[in-house]
Every structure is written in C-alpha cells, then in structure tokens.
Regions:
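A short, ordered amphipathic alpha-helix with a cationic face
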Residues: 18-21, 62-65
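Amphipathic, charged alpha-helical segments and their helix-to-coil junctions
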Residues: 26-61, 81, 85-117
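Generic intrinsically disordered, low-complexity segments enriched for polar/acidic and small residues
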Residues: 14-15, 71, 89
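Short, well-ordered alpha-helical segments
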Residues: 63-78
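Bacterial N-terminal signal peptides that target proteins for export
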Residues: 1-10
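Bacterial N-terminal signal peptides
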Residues: 9-20
Length: 117
C-alpha cells in the first residue's frame, strides 16, 4: 500500500514538473532543439547535462537553470514522500525518456549514451 501511495505521489510530482517546464515558454522549444541536436542530454538520475564542449554560455546557463528547478522539485517530493531526492530524480528520468523528443540522448548508469529513436 505504501508503495502505491509513493508511486501516485511521484506521478503527481512529475506532472507538476512538466507543467512548470512547459509554462516557461521560450525555454521549452530551445531545450527540445538542443536535445535533438545532441548538445544536451538526460542522465539516468534526472539531471540535464551538456554533451558538447562547444556549447556556449547561454546553453550552459539554460542547463543550470533547468537543473536548479529540477533539484527543487526532487527535494520537495522527497521530503513529502520520505524518500531520497535521487529516487525522485530516477523516477522523473524514466518518465522523461518516454516524453522526450526523438534524437534525445540518455546517459545510463553504465556510462553509455543511447539516442532515442
């Protein structure tokens, strides 16, 4: 029973995150474009990472901003559910892998990059 409550709560948290990201307007399309181009990728723990050394300061700033917002959400969800923020991040990463555009790169726990088709 506790597991199902945690799953429901984490699902609500994930939906809240997606709504907050989509509400940001101009950042969302540029983030998807950066994902498709392989400039940024998603890590197994729900952290956005820069994949290319040539990424400019605007890209790095966007990544920092997205990760700061994600950290807040992960920590808030973790506190409410009595779980670790990393657990929340991993659940988010699984959902993100389903919703991210084709071409997005994902870094697995094994250190290997895989591109979404």
């Amino acid at each position: 029973m506790k597991g199902s409550r945690t799953a429901v709560a984490l699902s609500i948290l994930i939906v809240t995150f997606f709504v907050s990201v989509c509400a940001r307007g101009a950042d969302a399309p540029s983030l998807d474009d950066l994902r498709r181009k392989g400039v940024v990728g998603e890590r197994y723990d729900g952290v956005l990472v820069v994949r290319t050394e040539s990424a400019d300061s605007a890209v790095r700033s966007l990544v920092d901003s997205v990760n700061a917002k994600r950290r807040e959400i992960y920590e808030s969800g973790a506190k409410k559910q009595g779980v670790g923020a990393q657990e929340v991040g991993k659940v988010y990463a699984l959902e993100l892998s389903k919703k991210a555009p084709a071409g997005t790169w994902f870094l697995g726990e094994d250190g290997k990059w895989v591109q979404k088709k």
